[in-house]
Amino acid sequence: MSHPHLSRRQLLSLMGASAVTVVATACGSQDDSTDTSGGSSSITAKSDPLRRFRHGVASGEPLPNAVVIWTRVTPSDDALPGTGKGAATEVFWEIARDAEFKNLVQSGKVMSSALRDHTLHIDVTELQPSTSYWYRFATTDGLSPTGRTKTAPALNAKPAALRFGMVTCAEYEFGFFAGYRHLADRN
């Protein structure tokens, strides 16, 4: 009896696709996105990330044509994580090909909710493979830090090298976790 054989590449591709499917299903959003290819940013909020975006930004689940971008908005000082407090807040997001946001690719707006602890997961699609993008979030009175992400290589690509970095929930309250900086510095 012969057993089917999967190459390491096929196994990793299958595992990645399965994980993305689970996360995308679990983290759906009510995103009102717009293709703004080639346009410039219209966000005019003040850059005060500690006011509304105390938890920063993150990205993950890279596919050749998509990434997930994340943030947590703090709509009021008492809306700390896990409290269930804070009014629903309109949050704008942008993703661009440059750090100055002069070449926007997409933008949109979503509503945060205490039911989701004011965390936002945006599945940004229709991106180019192996491409770096910059992203950010804004409210009417706050602008998040800018994040940088990169899409995965095309499915038929054969890159000379491919590196993965994996992190899990770090419970920031127990340390500063310099490991994240080391991961970013290795890029």
What would you call each of these model-derived segments?
Residues 17, 29, 61:
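Gly/Ser/Thr-rich helix-start
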Residues 30-39:
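Bacterial Sec signal peptide processing site at the extreme N-terminus
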Residues 25-26:
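C-terminal motif of bacterial Sec signal peptides marking the signal peptidase cleavage site
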Residues 8, 38-46:
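N-terminal, polar/Ser/Thr-rich
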Residues 1-22:
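N-terminal secretory signal peptides and thylakoid transit peptides that target proteins
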Residues 43-187:
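Divalent metal-dependent phosphoesterase catalytic cores across multiple superfamilies
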